[in-house]
Amino acid sequence: GVDSYKKNNCDGVIAFGGGSGLDVGKAIAFMSGQNLPIWDFEDVGDNWTKANSDKIAPIIAVPTTAGTGSETGRASVILNEETGVKNIIFHPKFLPSIVILDPILTVGLPAKMTAATGMDALAHNLEAYCAPGYHPMADGIALEGMRLINKWLLEAVSNGSNIEARMNMLTAASMGSTAFQKGLGAIHSLSHPVNALNNIHHGLSNAIFMPYVLTFNKDVIEKKIIKICDYLELKDRSFDGFVNWVLDLRKKLD
């Protein structure tokens, strides 16, 4: 991708597709002006400061799925095929300059992929809200992202041509990526190695791990989960009620 960028004298990248497509496009824009290997910029410590910031190409992001929210993220997740490890490559300028959210582009997404990417968006919003630390803006964004998913995910899966549902899911996905600047959790910590080793869709593995991680973390997140229940106006506004909501959502999406 970088060779093609240079060969054609490009001056920017339009990253088009799902999370993987967007991440690769962002990585090409980033690496087009770097001399070090991409792995030297893994999101560890201040590695990002090694980059030549002036040589990072501008990025326009056009997502065609509603899951990763990579269009509002400052990183790319790239699989190192030699090690089998999914590495997070970070730089503030990974954040696209322009994002185009067009629900028409997601209408043809199959129901199973709509469900899996939707659960990825839910995991982002949920883990961001439950992450420790004080970030009221991220918390507010995450809560509203979960409300949109609660209202629109099942509709987007069952009626893929519903433009309103598709637009709201795109919005929720972008909100999730924005919110998780606060942090993520064990759902993603468990998912990434499983995805890399077994080629399981990231959203699917998030959905699998979600209720187990919630239960494991009950003692430290219960108060936050009850606030989520209140915001989503669930019938059973308890920790167990929320876990049952997740289980019921998974069952309906299966």
Predicted regions span which residues?
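Buried hydrophobic packing segments
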Residues: 24-29, 125-126, 146-152, 172-176, ...
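Glycine/threonine-rich beta-strand-loop-alpha-helix active-site module
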Residues: 2-3, 7-101
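Glycine-rich phosphate/pyrophosphate-binding beta-alpha loops
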Residues: 67, 175-206
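Mobile late-domain/C-terminal helix-loop "cap" segments
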Residues: 211-254
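Phosphate-handling active-site elements
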Residues: 34-43, 199-201, 219-222
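Generic hydrophobic alpha-helical segments
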Residues: 1-5, 149, 242, 246
